[in-house]
Structure formats: structure tokens, C-alpha cells
Swiss-Prot record:
Domain of life: Bacteria
Reactions accelerated catalytically: L-histidinol + 2 NAD(+) + H2O = L-histidine + 2 NADH + 3 H(+)
Gene that this polypeptide is encoded by: hisD
SUPFAM superfamilies registered for this protein in UniProt: ALDH-like
Its job: Catalyzes the sequential NAD-dependent oxidations of L-histidinol to L-histidinaldehyde and then to L-histidine.
Molecular function terms, GO-annotated: histidinol dehydrogenase activity; NAD binding; zinc ion binding
Name of the protein in its database record: Histidinol dehydrogenase
Residue positions of the active site: 327-328
Length: 430
């Protein structure tokens, strides 16, 4: 049964707070098993990868090789429908152009004392991209993770992807080449994360790891963090649609189901001020559910985690939307643009009835790797900046040191750090 919350109910605040705190996935306690895998890969390298791949993916890497060859990628292009390849090229080009606008500029200036300050940006040298296998092996995710790295100037982009029973999604290989991925390895799970972090005889280590994965992959990313950087630990997908009665209920229902079909733990929320419209959308959802290939997944998601929130008016929707802090926020109301400046917390905002979130998934150009589970309150979607580092610059001459040095000495001595004070004083003959 879909959850319905009415703002006019006296216990609405209590129910809404409980709704916000609800968990959509059970965290498996896999840390001990994952730590054993990570430690073994760190010790044994390729030997451990071969063993785990036989056990978990039923593939003999001694026969296939760990690395995916150029010939295999060529074959993937031959197998891929030409229309799909063209669509992926369009997506790639739009992602590239949008992310190029995110490139930061170096800055250097001289202040009133003559001190030179500034910062410069450099790309991370090597990054690893984890791509899940099976039903979650999406070529669009390859583009979304790899293209910002390419735009940032990352020298080496390494992709790992499991090959259950020896099978790789050809479109994933196509997307990898289109995005400029440097190396591809047919390994997955926690063992692939460990290989990227520590290196093996075949796989050289990287400096940062990005990409989604299951509980084992997420645990491995947490374990290796510090040795390498990571992007985020993403949860199930979610959408909040704020819509008025002038929308076509079938359109809104389709958008809700586009999230629901991702995962049984995905969440689709409708927020409206019109109960009759809400009922019409719910009826449209039920009609459309039975037309989907992933009916079982979408039905479970909508039944267990779907929600309708009835507000008194759309002015009340804004603070509620900010508290939900949805990964995806669709605003389909008469003056959608007026809402946008007042939304503080959302991973990505889709403005107007002709901007379904699905366009953002594929060809809009914005990144679809976004914060979930209310983490949009404090974090952002993947961007070029995730593949870059900022280094501060500072330059003083003798005059500037004489002007600033005494204050530095004073603070150092107050903190009991004599060597700090001496580092400046010795230059000033103090």
C-alpha cells in the first residue's frame, strides 16, 4: 500500500519525520568478509583475483585473461546496434560539453602587502571506475563517470567490470571506448576495489575509485578509503515530483515508475495539493505497471516505498522538499522557475513538465551520479571537480616576511611551538 501523508492531518509532522527516517535497504554486515578479501588481494595480487573470479563469477581468468582486449571491444562495436551507438555518442558529446564548463580556473594575485597568493588546479593522475555486472551494468553510467574524468585531464582511467559466466555487456565496452577509458579489466566485487587501491601484477593502482556497487563493493570502498579517494557510498535511487493538477497523470505516473523499476528499494514520491489528481496518478501507475518488463521490481518499489504527500498549497511544498533532499526533484507546476531559487537541497532539479528525469539519466548533459538518502543536504553530484585537486600558492619576499613575520612568531610562541617561531625568527635575525 502506497504511503499517503496529508498536511492537514494533526499528526502530519510526526508521520513526516518518521517517513524521512525510514530505511529502504538493510545494511548487510559484510565488513569481516570484505576485509579478508581486500587483505588477500593486497597480499597475493593476481592469484587472489583468479580465485575469487572462479568462485564468484564462474570464470577462469587464466584462460580469458584479466584485461579486456582491443579485439573484444571491436567485437562489441560490431555486436551493438548502430542506433544505440549513435545515441551513446550524442550522450557523450553533451556530457563532455556540459562538464567542460565546470573546469575551474587557476588564480594568483598580489595583496596590499605585496604577498602573492593563489591556487592552481591539477587532475588526479589515475582513477578507477567500478561498473556493476548483471542487470545494473549500464553504459550510461560508464559515460557519466568517465567523461568528467576525461574532461578534467585524468591521464589514466581504469575500468573494472565483473564478467559473470564470462559475459560482458557489449554496450558497456562501447561506452568505455567512447569515453576514453584507458584500461578495462574483467574483475568485480570487493576484489576489484582492492586491486584498484593496492595494485596487482596486472592492474596498476589508482588514486581514486568511483562508481556504484553492491554491499560488498561499498564496504570495500570504505576500507580502502585513505589509501585512495572515493566518490560516495550511494544508496537506492529516488525521485520527488512536485506537480499540480494541470499535468497529465499518465506523464507523472511514467516518471514515478522510471525510478521504481531501478530497484525494489528505489523510492518514488508525488507531492501535490490536489487529492483528485493524486488519485488519478495512482490509477495511472497501476495501469502502467503491468506493461513493464520489470513489473515485479517496480511493483515492489511502489508498494513498499512509494508515497503521496498532499500539501495545502505549493508554498508549503518548498520546505518539505528541502527536508526530503531528494536525489532527483521534478518541479511540474505553473511557475516552476520560481521554485528553483528556493530549493536548497536536491541532487538535481528538473524544471517543467517537459523535463522528465530520464532525460537527465541519459542525454541531458548533467551528471546522473547524485547524492541519495538525503545526503543532498551536504553533498553534490559527480563533477569535473571530483577528479581534480586544488593546491594553494604563497610567495613572500623579504619585505613581506618582515611585515608578517612578527605576528607569526607571536602566535607560534603562544601555541608553545618554538621551532615554528624560530623558522621565521632566524630569517629576520630576531
Amino acid at each position: 500500500m502506497v504511503t499517503t501523508l496529508r498536511q492537514t492531518d494533526p499528526d502530519f509532522e510526526q508521520k513526516f519525520a518518521a517517513f524521512l527516517s525510514g530505511k529502504r535497504e538493510v545494511s548487510e554486515d559484510v565488513d569481516r568478509a570484505v576485509r579478508e578479501i581486500v587483505d588477500r588481494v593486497r597480499r597475493e595480487g593476481d592469484s587472489a583475483l583468479l580465485d575469487y573470479s572462479r568462485r564468484f563469477d564462474r570464470i577462469d581468468l587464466e584462460k580469458t585473461g584479466i584485461a579486456v582486449t582491443e579485439a573484444e571491444i571491436d567485437a562489441a562495436f560490431d555486436a551493438a546496434p548502430a542506433s544505440t551507438v549513435e545515441a551513446l555518442k550524442l550522450a557523450r558529446d553533451r556530457i563532455e560539453k556540459h562538464h567542460a564548463r565546470q573546469l575551474p580556473k587557476d588564480d594568483r594575485y598580489t595583496d596590499a602587502l605585496g604577498v602573492e597568493l593563489g591556487s592552481r588546479w591539477t587532475a588526479i593522475e589515475a582513477v578507477g571506475l567500478y561498473v556493476p555486472g548483471g542487470t545494473a551494468s549500464y553504459p550510461s553510467s560508464v559515460l557519466m563517470n568517465a567523461m568528467p574524468a576525461k574532461v578534467a585531464g585524468v591521464d589514466r582511467i581504469v575500468m573494472v567490470v565483473p564478467a559473470p559466466d564470462g559475459n560482458l555487456n557489449p554496450l558497456v565496452l562501447v561506452a568505455a571506448r567512447l569515453a576514453g577509458v584507458s584500461e578495462i579489466y574483467r574483475v568485480g566485487g570487493a576484489q576489484a576495489i582492492a586491486a584498484l587501491a593496492y595494485g596487482t601484477e596486472t592492474i596498476r593502482p589508482v588514486a581514486k575509485i568511483v562508481g556504484p556497487g553492491n554491499a560488498y563493493v561499498a564496504a570495500a570502498k570504505r576500507i580502502v578509503f585513505g589509501t585512495v579517494g572515493i566518490d560516495m557510498i550511494a544508496g537506492p535511487s529516488e525521485v520527488l515530483i512536485v506537480a499540480d493538477k494541470d499535468n497529465n497523470p499518465d506523464w507523472i505516473a511514467a516518471d514515478l515508475l522510471a525510478q521504481a523499476e531501478h530497484d525494489m528499494a528505489a523510492q518514488s514520491i508525488l507531492m501535490t495539493n490536489d487529492e483528485a489528481f493524486a488519485h488519478a496518478v495512482e490509477e495511472a501507475v497501476e495501469r502502467q505497471l503491468h506493461t513493464l518488463a520489470r513489473t515485479e521490481t517496480a511493483s515492489a518499489s511502489w508498494r513498499d516505498f512509494g508515497a503521496v504527500i498532499l500539501v495545502k498549497d505549493f508554498e508549503d511544498a518548498i520546505p518539505l522538499a528541502n527536508r526530503i533532499a531528494a536525489e532527483h526533484l521534478e518541479i511540474a507546476v505553473a511557475d516552476a522557475e520560481a521554485f528553483v531559487p528556493r530549493i536548497r537541497n536536491a541532487g538535481s532539479i528538473f524544471i517543467g513538465g517537459y523535463t522528465p528525469e530520464v532525460i537527465g539519466d541519459y542525454v541531458g548533459g548533467c551528471n546522473h551520479v547524485l547524492p541519495t538518502a538525503r545526503s543532498a543536504r551536504f553533498s553534490s553530484g559527480l563533477s569535473v571537480l571530483d577528479y581534480m585537486k586544488r593546491t594553494s600558492l604563497l610567495k613572500l619576499g623579504s619585505e613581506q616576511l618582515r611585515a608578517l613575520g612578527p605576528a607569526a612568531i607571536e602566535i607560534a610562541r603562544a601555541e608553545g611551538l618554538d621551532a615554528h617561531a624560530q623558522s621565521v625568527a632566524i630569517r629576520l635575525n630576531l
